[in-house]
Swiss-Prot record:
It is a single-pass membrane protein. Its main location: membrane. PANTHER family: MEMBRANE FUSION PROTEIN (MFP) FAMILY PROTEIN (PTHR30386:SF27), MEMBRANE FUSION SUBUNIT OF EMRAB-TOLC MULTIDRUG EFFLUX PUMP (PTHR30386). GO terms for cellular component: plasma membrane. Changing C132A: In strain: 405 / Serotype 8. The keyword Cell division does not apply. Belongs to the membrane fusion protein (MFP) (TC 8.A.1) family. It comes from Actinobacillus pleuropneumoniae. This is RTX-III toxin determinant D.
């Protein structure tokens, strides 16, 4: 190994010495300097050899190399913006308000015209919903009748508690929709039902009183035969003593014993009858209570049903009133009337048909842009964007500048672009300039938003296809 190193050292030393000697005599090796006309008189081949090479090709070569070097340096140093293009349109932050009817209706009055400024709450249209007035009146009458029935039931309950009719007042506001004949009928019905209940109760009270009288009669007979039985028993005892001393005959004793047995049997019969009368009396008392309980239970059941029907009719009336209110269309916000589509009084409008659009006053103009699926991963909130309005060429009117405000988290299906993500971009102004003239932008104008997602050097941009090709070529498929 050492010999190899020594050999290489001697080899390079020899060439260094030779180069040094040649360098010393380098000027002697040059051709003698001649003038241009001297070179012209030389033979052709010598003229070509001796004539100095022109400096222009060398200068051009140097310039090309310089430009190439500068291009490489600039491509490394300079950066280009990476943008994600998104199509969209200008919208107001509060969005334009579409005015639509909730149902089919006839146009009764039109109070605005296209381009007119309206205040919030100002009357726009007056519609007539088909059958709304009739439905409301019908429901109102039905509700009044139900309230009248409810008042009748409550009056009867009061009558049951106090055993007399209350002072009936049918001039309340709840009964304004009820006709007088209905009120009179209700008054008569209350009186009739109360009197019927009173008669039934009176009949039961009479039956109860009869049973009480019968009970008193039975009690009197019981007391009578208790006394008679006691007396006959004492007589029988005395006669037994006389019979024992042979003072009376046996027939007299047996006759007295028979009278005692008869008195005892009559007493037993009336005592048994007393139990039956007491049972009948208890039943009569229950029947008397049952008349009131059944009448009250029937009234309470009907009152409960009446309350349910009244609630349903109240909701139905509110629904009809809401239909009437919905037919009177007012401006939801202050703004300008646009796209007015109905101009004929008496014309027909259909459910959810857009009658006009209200562009809100002093609302912020924004861009609603659709970001393609391939770009959404690089777009972030706060990134800057350049907005080009298709209506006005940017080469003449310039751009709008903005920042990404929001990005939806869920994609939506677009018929041309496929799955896209909706985003909102704030813009710095809502006008474009053409010389000294300012052009007002409006909602609905189509735009192209170029969102700046980053920067990239020019050299990497140029080499990326090569890098991609190399990467794919070195991979087994």
């Amino acid at each position: 190994m050492k010999l190899w190193i020594l050999g290489l050292g001697e080899f390079f030393q020899r060439y260094r010495n030779i180069w040094r000697e040649i360098w010393k005599i380098r000027k002697q090796l040059d051709t003698p300097a001649r003038q241009k006309d001297e070179n012209e008189f030389l033979p052709r081949h010598l003229e070509l050899i001796e004539t100095p090479i022109s400096k222009k090709p060398r200068l051009i070569a140097y310039l090309i190399m310089l430009f190439l070097f500068l291009a490489i340096v600039i491509s490394i140093i300079s950066k280009v913006e990476i943008v994600a293009s998104a199509t969209g349109k200008l919208v107001f932050s509060g969005h334009s308000k579409e005015i639509k009817p909730i149902e089919n209706a006839l146009v009764k009055d039109i109070f605005v015209k296209d381009g007119q400024f309206v205040e919030k709450g100002q009357l726009l249209l007056n519609l007539t919903a088909l059958g709304c007035d009739a439905d409301k009146q019908k429901t109102k009458v039905s509700l009044g009748l139900e309230r009248l029935d409810g008042y009748r039931y409550k009056s009867l309950l009061y009558s049951i508690e106090h055993n007399r009719l209350p002072l009936l007042d049918f001039n309340q506001a709840d009964f304004d929709s009820v006709q007088e004949e209905d009120k009179t009928g209700a008054r008569h019905l209350i009186t009739e039902q109360f009197e019927t209940w009173q008669k039934q109760k009176y009949q039961k009270e009479l039956a109860y009183q009869r049973k009480q009288a019968e009970k008193q009669t039975v009690l009197a007979n019981i007391r009578k035969y208790e006394s008679a039985s006691r007396i006959e028993k004492e007589k029988l005892s005395d006669l037994k003593k006389l019979y024992d001393v042979k003072s009376i005959s046996k027939h007299e004793l047996l006759a007295q014993e028979n009278r005692y047995v008869e008195a005892s049997n009559e007493l037993s019969v009336y005592q048994s009858h007393l139990k039956e009368v007491e049972s009948d009396l208890l039943k009569a008392q229950e029947d008397l209570k049952l008349v009131t309980q059944l009448f009250k239970s029937d009234i309470l059941e009907k009152l409960q049903q009446n309350i349910q029907r009244e609630k349903q009719l109240t909701l139905e009336l509110e629904k009809n009133e809401q239909r009437q209110l919905a037919s009177i269309i007012r401006a939801p916000v202050s703004g300008t009337v646009q796209q007015l589509k109905t101009h004929t009084k008496g014309g027909v409008v259909t459910t959810a048909e857009t009658l006009m659009v209200i562009a809100p006053e002093d609302d912020v103009l924004e861009v609603s842009a659709l970001i393609q699926n391939k770009d959404v991963g690089f777009v972030e909130i706060g990134q800057e964007a350049v907005i080009k309005v298709e209506t006005f060429p940017y080469t003449r009117y310039g751009y709008l500048y903005g920042k990404v405000k929001t990005i939806t988290l869920d994609a939506i299906e677009h018929p041309q672009l496929g799955l896209v993500f909706n985003s909102i971009i704030e813009i710095n102004k809502k006008t474009l300039t053409d010389g000294d003239k300012e052009i007002q932008l409006g909602s609905g104008m189509s735009v192209i938003a170029e969102i700046k997602t980053g920067e990239r050097s020019v050299i990497s941009f140029l080499l990326s296809p090569l890098e991609e090709s190399i990467t794919e070529s070195l991979r087994e498929r």
